[in-house]
Amino acid sequence: MLDKVKNVIVVLSGKGGVGKSTVSTQLALALRQTGHKVGLLDIDLCGPSVPYLLGLEGSDIFQCDEGWVPIYTDESQTLAVMSIGFLLKNRTDPVIWRGPKKTMMIRQFLTDVKWDELDYLIIDTPPGTSDEHITVMECLREVPCNGAIIVTTPQGVALDDVRKEITFCKKTGIKLLGIVENMSGFVCPHCTSCTNIFSSNGGVELAKYAQIPHLGTLPIDPRVGVLAGTTASVLDELPDSTTAEVLRGLVQHLDSITLTA
């Protein structure tokens, strides 16, 4: 049930392992930290990371007359979370389902969760372009989906997959809000200097190619990794970091193009 949700943002990636779930989680925390009521929906059925990233593993979800009740991370209920990870007994349990069952579960996540009034719903999707993505796009045609943010790394093989993701979005009619380049350089945890490990600026060039905004470049920062398993926002814990700067800019960009009043 998305009738109380003002804005829906889908987070996509062309391939796995690019940090999409970390970006989704920290974006949700940054939006909450700046005063918004936020929902985070993890529909990466085969690799749900959000419960681990927020330290919510082992949480039980319940049903009410209106559907599933999400897990809230705080007493003020400013961040609500739903993930298939809450339905698994163990984090290592595989989800061995055929396409139709995955499709049914995604539809349930998008229609049967009792979200209260939200300024933003962030949807963390599986990597690639598959049946799951088609199901998401079909369901979101009935609600005001603002568009998609694509997360990539600067390497050529990742960028090739992102080109497919861009084509997929155009063919399914979802607006592209921009590209975030992740893992661009390594931040030394001692001196905070940044050293390139892979190639750089691939996301910038791809944004130019696709004529969509480049929303920021994030380095590999071990200090951010330490926050995994907590509900701590980079904006609070590392306010002077490059990651915090990019997230603040991303929040401002979303606020400028969405309805949050």
From Swiss-Prot:
Sequence positions that bind ATP: G14, K15, G16, G17, V18, G19, K20, S21
Functional note: Component of the cytosolic iron-sulfur (Fe/S) protein assembly (CIA) machinery. Required for maturation of extramitochondrial Fe-S proteins. The Nubp1-Nubp2 heterotetramer forms a Fe-S scaffold complex, mediating the de novo assembly of an Fe-S cluster and its transfer to target apoproteins.
PROSITE patterns tied to this protein: MRP
Domain of life of the native organism: Eukaryota
Compartments, as annotated in UniProt: Cytoplasm
Family: Belongs to the Mrp/NBP35 ATP-binding proteins family. NUBP2/CFD1 subfamily.
Cofactor(s) essential for the protein: [4Fe-4S] cluster
Binding-site residues for [4Fe-4S] cluster, renumbered to this chain: C188, C191
Chief location bin: cytoplasm
Record's keyword terms, sorted: 4Fe-4S, ATP-binding, Cytoplasm, Iron, Iron-sulfur, Metal-binding, Nucleotide-binding
GO annotation, cellular component aspect: cytosol
Subunit architecture: Heterotetramer of 2 Nubp1 and 2 Nubp2 chains.
GO terms under biological process: iron-sulfur cluster assembly
Cofactor note: Binds 4 [4Fe-4S] clusters per heterotetramer. Contains two stable clusters in the N-termini of Nubp1 and two labile, bridging clusters between subunits of the Nubp1-Nubp2 heterotetramer.
Protein name: Cytosolic Fe-S cluster assembly factor Nubp2 homolog
GO molecular function, one term: ATP-dependent FeS chaperone activity
TM region positions: none
